[in-house]
From Swiss-Prot:
Task performed by this protein: Required for the synthesis of amylose.
Keywords: Amyloplast, Chloroplast, Glycosyltransferase, Plastid, Starch biosynthesis, Transferase, Transit peptide
Name under which the protein is recorded: Granule-bound starch synthase 1, chloroplastic/amyloplastic
Gene3D superfamilies: Glycogen Phosphorylase B
Top-rank taxon: Eukaryota
Xref: Pfam families: Glyco_transf_5, Glycos_transf_1
InterPro entries attached to this UniProt entry: Glyco_trans_1, GS/SS, Starch_synth_cat_dom
């Protein structure tokens, strides 16, 4: 267990807050003369931390005001709502490489809007301009070293965003890590990832007990020990192990529970069995990590498997769609050799939502023409022309335009798509691909303009404005994933009235309805080593079906079906709440639905 080394600081030392800015709720907790830091946050010393209990303010009937003084909806907080702590390596918009960051960016505010107290804990990869130094320091044993760790904090959309500060995460003190969260380049991990994520898990267990947070109008003080932790993917799989060995074995966190969420079963954290000693766990936990497979990487033979341990040691296992949950237990290949363990422990699938504030065609700052379901048929031809002009395609509102947005790798089926383009490009169609990933795939899509100058474009860059323009201006969104736990591209596309042509896998089955909001190609071969000719044929055939409907009344109806759906996080948050309440943590009660407190910050960059 960590040693607390927080000292008593005056407020102006920490994060630059003035004394006038920081006198929020001074009388709520008497903490042995500790000085207030930013926004009412105070360090907690080791004498106080076991005595603190969370207090909740009475909910305001008039709603709260955001930082600009404008009313931004109502949040109804019950005194006995859950204390939820989400732990992950990505939290949008501060740091994300895929769906994990979007989930931890969007789901916590939706649960906060239901009246629960919610925290996220994530590494501090960059110097986020809206996250303040709390001046709380803890010492953690990582491998054979004792490492001091600081906590930074930001309060956004009703959620305490906590960032773990350590040189293993923030490699350049003055600069950005370039979104290289897991390794120096795609497909290559940092050698010390096990130590990095061990530190993250330990810090996440300390945060609810040592951070005295008072930014909310509804809650104050530390979260206490009656907490539900939600660990996300293999990087956080040590959390239930440390909870049991470092805390519950000493009578601490006795009511706390851990839910473990699988966002992508393909990434499991497999390492040499000899590395178990780095984790500082008792030998009795070796069985939870012990794993033998037929692969030579990272070493041949016996290994430790972090995700296996997370599944076996957590109190409940989740994943990000009902159909993906079914796939994970269906066979060895789809469960990636963990299917037996998932069947033993059980799994609950809940579809993701999406950020309907950032992705809103009626207010999208990247679109020249704003629209809703009543004006979509007038707006989309204009937006398609603007998109064609932007990428250098012949401007023609009457030619169908297919878009692809995603990582250029085997999981997303970019190799299948590339093989299929030459077969369907002779049809009356244009295609635009946007994405980054493996160099060989980036080079392939960049050659499309040379091969089909009037038909195709490939942009191997991270380009947010272009992603929004494609989502709005394309007639179809092509999603040829070999497997897709949930997927967000299809949600964004449907929100903007763009039907999807998608593989029948994972969350795509749950969210895209054949003939109603899109077209299903069928399931693809999950073997990423080769391109199955049958999969290529499925793409060609389904593209043909979609193009045959283009311009018809049925197609207009499909566009409106897409836009009429409820795709926000409200529904998923209610489903998550129901299952988390079943864990029976003391003091937990259902929330009351309200609106999110404030819009998400759109830009969080390093301070020079």
């Amino acid at each position: 267990m960590a040693t607390i080394t927080a000292s008593h600081f005056v407020s102006h030392v920490c994060g630059g807050a003035t004394s006038g800015e920081s006198k929020v709720g001074l009388g709520q907790l008497a903490l042995r003369s500790q000085a207030v830091t930013h926004n009412g946050l105070r360090p907690v010393n080791k004498i106080d931390m076991l005595q603190l209990r969370t207090s909740a303010k009475k909910p305001s009937k008039n709603g709260r005001e955001n930082e600009g003084g404008m009313a931004a909806g109502t949040i109804v907080c019950k005194q006995q709502g859950m204390n939820l702590v989400f732990v992950g390596c990505e939290v949008g918009p501060w740091c994300k490489t895929g769906g994990l960051g979007d989930v931890l960016g969007g789901l916590p505010p939706a649960l906060a809007a239901r009246g629960h107290r919610v925290m996220t804990v994530c590494p501090r990869y960059d110097q986020y301009k809206d996250a303040w130094d709390t001046c709380v320091v803890v010492e953690l044993q990582v491998g054979d070293r004792i490492e001091p760790v600081r906590f930074f904090h930001s309060y956004k959309r009703g959620v305490d965003r906590v960032f773990v500060d350590h040189p293993m995460f923030l490699e350049k003190v003055w600069g950005k890590t370039g979104s290289m969260l897991y390794g120096p380049k795609a497909g290559k991990d940092y050698k010390d990832n096990q130590l990095r994520f061990s530190l993250l898990c330990q810090a996440a267990l300390e945060a609810p007990r040592v951070l005295n947070l008072n930014s909310s109008n509804y809650f104050s003080g530390p979260y206490g020990e009656d907490v539900v932790f939600v660990a996300n993917d293999w990087h956080t799989a040590l959390l239930p192990c440390y909870l049991k060995t470092m805390y519950q074995s000493r009578g601490i966190y006795m009511n706390a529970k851990v839910a473990f969420c699988i966002h992508n079963i393909a990434y499991q954290g497999r390492f040499a069995f000899s590395d178990f000693s780095l984790l500082n766990l008792p030998d009795e936990y070796k069985g939870s990590f012990d794993f033998i497979d037929g692969y030579d990487k990272p070493v041949k033979g016996r290994k430790i498997n972090w995700m296996k341990a997370g599944i076996r040691e957590a109190d409940r296992v989740f994943t990000v769609s009902p159909n993906y949950a079914k796939e994970l237990v269906s066979c060895v290949s789809k469960g990636v050799e963990l299917d037996n363990h998932i069947r033993d422990c059980g799994i609950t699938g809940i579809c993701n939502g999406m950020d309907t504030q950032e992705w809103n065609p009626a207010t999208d700052k990247y679109l020249a023409v704003k629209y809703d379901i009543t004006t979509v048929m007038q707006a989309k031809p204009l937006l398609k022309e603007a998109l064609q002009a932007a990428v250098g395609l012949p401007v023609d509102r009457n030619i169908p335009l297919i878009g692809f947005i995603g990582r250029l790798e085997e999981q997303k089926g970019s190799d299948i798509l590339y093989a299929a383009i030459s077969k369907f490009i002779s049809m009356d169609v244009q295609i635009l691909i946007l994405g980054t990933g493996k160099k060989k795939f980036e080079q392939q899509i960049e050659q499309l303009e040379v091969m089909y100058p009037d038909k195709a474009r490939g942009v191997a860059k991270f380009n947010v404005p272009l992603a929004h323009m494609i989502t709005a201006g394309a007639d179809f969104m092509l999603i040829p994933s070999r497997f897709e736990p949930c997927g967000l591209i299809q949600l964004h596309a449907m929100r903007y009235g763009t039907p999807c042509i998608c593989a029948s896998t994972g969350g795509l089955v749950d969210t895209v309805k054949e003939g109603y909001t899109g077209f299903h190609m069928g399931a693809f071969n999950v073997d990423c080593e080769t391109v199955d000719p049958e999969d290529v044929l499925k793409v060609i055939t389904t593209v043909g079906r979609a193009l045959a409907m283009y311009g018809t009344l049925a197609f207009t109806e499909m566009i409106k079906n897409c836009m009429s759906q409820e795709l926000s996080w409200k529904g998923p948050a209610k489903n998550w709440e129901t299952v988390l309440l079943s864990l029976g943590v003391a003091g937990s009660e259902p929330g009351v639905e309200g609106d999110e407190i404030a819009p998400l910050a759109k830009e969080n960059v390093a301070t020079p």
